[in-house]
Amino acid sequence: MKEQKKVFIKTLGCQMNEYDSARMHEVLNEHFDTVKTDDYKDADIILINTCSIREKAQEKVFHELGRWKGIKKTNEDLIIGVGGCVASQEGENIIKRAPFVDLVFGPQTIHRLPEMIKQKQKSQQSQVDISFPEVEKFDYLPEPKAEGAKAYVSIMEGCDKYCSYCVVPYTRGPEVNRPFEDVLAECAILAEQGVKEITLLGQNVNHYLGPMENGQTADLALLIHFIAEIDGIERIRFTTSHPVEFSQNLIDAYATVPELANHLHLPVQHGSDRILINMKRNHTILEFKQKIRKLRAIRPDITISSDFIVGFPGETEEDFQKLLDLVKEINFDQSFSFIYSKRPGTPAADLPDDTPMEVKKDRLKRLQDLLNSNAQIISRQMVGTNQRILVDGTSKKDDNILSGRTENNRVVNFKGDKSLIGQFAMVKITESLPNSLRGELI
């Protein structure tokens, strides 16, 4: 009989980490019959799945570990583990800085967690495995278990882009594409469990080149076509994309696959070609605009979100103004924007940077004000329209109100029977609020 253990997992960072955290619990459950707990003080195993994109995210890890240190003193059998990209980047240094940590594991070694725990218990020595094994983790992970009507499916790992500011190629490793048939099988399993919306994940997801059993290679567009044919799957998203691989095949899929959500997240990072060159993004603003124009010729009302970095080394006011101009021209929806964070070991970390932090903060505020204005206008334009909502559950503020999301990721709250949870519903939008919409069930 397997020993039951309570597991607490804290997830920082991107959707890929959310996916990995779910798989951590599944692989532990297969060996230890685990149950999740929301209270780390009640756990037998505490894991933190980390992000290293920005310095503040990295410091969050050690802040959390500091909170858990005291529990370890009163419970010697407690297992504390650090996974994710900070684990890959720091490795043994985590143990040196926090000796009470038992496990340090990378994104590619999740499947080894049970064995690492057993080795720790046997040897009483901290275990570190941040390797990039040739046999990918997907081969050893158990069948996914759906939690609701939406699910993430990882189709590739790693990145070969080596943008000058980014640590992902160093922490996630080179690109590894999951076999085409394996992805379809996972999507079919999830559909049988009631999943209706799939989000395909990868650090550079639209560069997916999955090996097929017939010896050919499938790109993301072909994969999307096949997933759309699976009974029960009614909405498909993908993230995160790179403009260079946003291909004509993928653009054409928006014309032929109605299940493909009418929303695209396509990180451009900046609006100045000079800055893009220094970022090693390998495309121009004109090339980006041309792809957006082709997409909008097919889906005129598609909403587009992005990622932006403000204050990159050498950024001038003229460069920044070009970024604002791009945001206005494309009419970007809700987006992620940050002040550049120097990451050790990346080429950009060595670039001279003499822009005062106050200037960077001012630019970030101006950018975010513009993005928020765009988003509010888009939300107000939705009032009076009928939207197809995937009902996630009840509102955080009122258990009698249902809540779900539109294709363009707007949260909509409306009255309805709880039997609609996990289903699609048509809702007329009646009011636009700063962070959500209100509607009426049709």
UniProtKB/Swiss-Prot annotation:
<protein>
    <recommendedName>
        <fullName>tRNA-2-methylthio-N(6)-dimethylallyladenosine synthase</fullName>
        <ecNumber>2.8.4.3</ecNumber>
    </recommendedName>
</protein>
<dbReference type="GO" id="GO:0005829">
    <property type="term" value="C:cytosol"/>
</dbReference>
<keyword id="KW-0408">Iron</keyword>
<keyword id="KW-0949">S-adenosyl-L-methionine</keyword>
<feature type="domain" description="TRAM">
    <location>
        <begin position="380"/>
        <end position="442"/>
    </location>
</feature>
<dbReference type="InterPro" id="IPR038135">
    <property type="entry name" value="Methylthiotransferase_N_sf"/>
</dbReference>
<comment type="similarity">
    <text>Belongs to the methylthiotransferase family. MiaB subfamily.</text>
</comment>
<dbReference type="Pfam" id="PF04055">
    <property type="entry name" value="Radical_SAM"/>
</dbReference>
<dbReference type="InterPro" id="IPR013848">
    <property type="entry name" value="Methylthiotransferase_N"/>
</dbReference>
<comment type="function">
    <text>Catalyzes the methylthiolation of N6-(dimethylallyl)adenosine (i(6)A), leading to the formation of 2-methylthio-N6-(dimethylallyl)adenosine (ms(2)i(6)A) at position 37 in tRNAs that read codons beginning with uridine.</text>
</comment>
<dbReference type="Pfam" id="PF01938">
    <property type="entry name" value="TRAM"/>
</dbReference>
<feature type="binding site">
    <location>
        <position position="166"/>
    </location>
    <ligand>
        <name>[4Fe-4S] cluster 2</name>
    </ligand>
</feature>
<dbReference type="InterPro" id="IPR023404">
    <property type="entry name" value="rSAM_horseshoe"/>
</dbReference>
<feature type="binding site">
    <location>
        <position position="163"/>
    </location>
    <ligand>
        <name>[4Fe-4S] cluster 2</name>
    </ligand>
</feature>
<keyword id="KW-0963">Cytoplasm</keyword>
<keyword id="KW-0479">Metal-binding</keyword>
<dbReference type="GO" id="GO:0051539">
    <property type="term" value="F:4 iron, 4 sulfur cluster binding"/>
</dbReference>
<dbReference type="InterPro" id="IPR020612">
    <property type="entry name" value="Methylthiotransferase_CS"/>
</dbReference>
<keyword id="KW-0411">Iron-sulfur</keyword>
<feature type="binding site">
    <location>
        <position position="14"/>
    </location>
    <ligand>
        <name>[4Fe-4S] cluster 1</name>
    </ligand>
</feature>
<feature type="domain" description="MTTase N-terminal">
    <location>
        <begin position="5"/>
        <end position="122"/>
    </location>
</feature>
<feature type="binding site">
    <location>
        <position position="85"/>
    </location>
    <ligand>
        <name>[4Fe-4S] cluster 1</name>
    </ligand>
</feature>
<dbReference type="Pfam" id="PF00919">
    <property type="entry name" value="UPF0004"/>
</dbReference>
<feature type="binding site">
    <location>
        <position position="159"/>
    </location>
    <ligand>
        <name>[4Fe-4S] cluster 2</name>
    </ligand>
</feature>
<dbReference type="InterPro" id="IPR007197">
    <property type="entry name" value="rSAM"/>
</dbReference>
<comment type="subunit">
    <text>Monomer.</text>
</comment>
<keyword id="KW-0004">4Fe-4S</keyword>
<keyword id="KW-0819">tRNA processing</keyword>
<keyword id="KW-0808">Transferase</keyword>
<dbReference type="InterPro" id="IPR006638">
    <property type="entry name" value="Elp3/MiaA/NifB-like_rSAM"/>
</dbReference>
<feature type="binding site">
    <location>
        <position position="51"/>
    </location>
    <ligand>
        <name>[4Fe-4S] cluster 1</name>
    </ligand>
</feature>
<dbReference type="InterPro" id="IPR005839">
    <property type="entry name" value="Methylthiotransferase"/>
</dbReference>
<dbReference type="GO" id="GO:0046872">
    <property type="term" value="F:metal ion binding"/>
</dbReference>
<dbReference type="GO" id="GO:0035597">
    <property type="term" value="F:N6-isopentenyladenosine methylthiotransferase activity"/>
</dbReference>
<dbReference type="InterPro" id="IPR006463">
    <property type="entry name" value="MiaB_methiolase"/>
</dbReference>
<dbReference type="InterPro" id="IPR002792">
    <property type="entry name" value="TRAM_dom"/>
</dbReference>
<feature type="domain" description="Radical SAM core">
    <location>
        <begin position="145"/>
        <end position="378"/>
    </location>
</feature>
